[in-house]
Amino acid sequence: MKIVLISGLSGSGKSVALRQMEDSGYFCVDNLPLEMLPALVSYHIERADETELAVSVDVRSGIDIGQAREQIAYLRGLGHRVEVLFVEAEESVLVRRFSETRRGHPLSNQDMTLLESLKKEREWLFPLKEIAYCIDTSKMNAQQLRHAVRQWLKVERTGLLVILESFGFKYGVPNNADFMFDMRSLPNPYYDPELRPYTGMDKPVWDYLDGQPLVQEMVDDIEKFLTHWLPRLEDESRSYVTVAIGCTGGQHRSVYVVEKLARRLKGRYELLIRHRQAQNLPSR
């Protein structure tokens, strides 16, 4: 049976993610105490219910991170496929969301401010984030988060999932990257008026960057680095690795390099491609 644990920071969109799981056909349970998870799985099996499970766990349920990882290992040992989805956002965004909704943080009390509560929650959940697929919702609305969850669900993962993500430095760096590479030293198609309207997925930009030796050297070096280190991470039983590729605006060079690496790594790893600035790319 496939079991998805959804966790993350309060205010980051866990409820939206759980609703998308329900819309995708999962049997969903919100705020389940972890010690009850094996009983829920057993009950589900006894009912001969083939519906996949999605369970939200967070600080409201008094989550013990050590226990969470033990429960995951236990269920995997029984043959279940257990995935972890972690939803997060930047601190300033979370503060704004709490201000807009006027809701209190689950850890807030007279002795702890909202910022202190957010910091404590982030530190508390970090060990769970380490083994999870992470979605940063800082620049997402609910519809975009739902789309990101649907894209993740489409990936049939049997081994290490490598997330290749392009981004623009001027919009901020992703905070969940395991490896980050900077493409700003490469020739920039943006300065060619004929190429500016295109993106790194379009043939004119591909033809231009394919003809740049420095670009090809960079792609070769990144591929060599990943080929060397990804097997080591896989040996450590890592489930997900995020490789972030950045350029100035996230339109040309980073998109091209991500697409190029995807072609080279295809067949060796399960891949998920994310273009972080997709909503900012020109439409033609």
Swiss-Prot record:
ATP binds at residues 8-15. It comes from the Bacteria. It holds the Pfam family RapZ-like_N. Keywords: ATP-binding, GTP-binding, Nucleotide-binding. InterPro entries: P-loop_NTPase (IPR027417), RapZ-like (IPR005337), RapZ-like_N (IPR053930), RapZ_C (IPR053931). GO terms for molecular function: ATP binding; GTP binding. GTP binds at residues 58-61. Displays ATPase and GTPase activities. Belongs to the RapZ-like family. This is Nucleotide-binding protein NMCC_0698.
